[in-house]
Design a protein with these regions (language model features):
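A surface-exposed partner-binding patch
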Residues: 1-93, 138-140
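Short active-site-adjacent structural elements
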Residues: 93-95, 114
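Short acidic-glycine loop/turn motifs at beta-strand connectors
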Residues: 97-100
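Compact, glycine/acidic-enriched structural inserts
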Residues: 113-134
Length: 141
């Protein structure tokens, strides 16, 4: 992960979140899923490839909006409780289904949820692999 963050131009300025800031978010809203919490505390957000993963500042803005969208749109879909973690360029919100652990995307303009990854760890590993492959291709040019 560290290597991917070093080679990616999209992670410049991304830094670990202070634990007290993470705890403030959790006391205000809800606990952050463990793997996402680890990423925030060790690296911050993730912009290696799509989907991007929110920094804490972005999460603080997105969480209330997600809660509203969850009530308005997402409650009709088949999934467990959800926690927003990022987004896609098409405006989709990316979330963790807290019951299954699956990472999914929801775009209110479409009728279905998009399956993105089996779990947060596999999503992160996929993003790291994409960034390392892109870095390798750039060096070859």
């Amino acid at each position: 992960i560290q290597t991917a963050y070093k080679v990616s131009p999209f992670t410049k300025g991304t830094c670990p979140e202070p634990e007290d800031a993470v705890k403030r978010f959790e006391s205000r809203y809800t606990p952050i899923p463990a793997e996402y919490r680890w990423l925030l505390l060790n690296f911050g957000g993730c912009y290696l490839a799509e989907p991007w993963i929110f920094t804490l500042k972005e999460l603080e803005k997105a969480y209330p909006i997600f809660q509203e969208a969850y009530e308005d749109y997402m409650s009709e879909y088949d999934h467990g409780p959800a926690f927003p973690i990022g987004g896609l360029g098409d405006g989709s919100i990316v979330f963790i289904d807290l019951e299954s652990g699956r990472v999914r995307g929801c775009n209110c303009d479409y009728a279905d949820l998009k399956e993105i990854a089996e779990n947060f760890s596999s999503l992160l590993l996929d993003l790291v692999e994409q960034a390392l492959e892109l870095g390798k291709l750039c060096r070859e040019l």
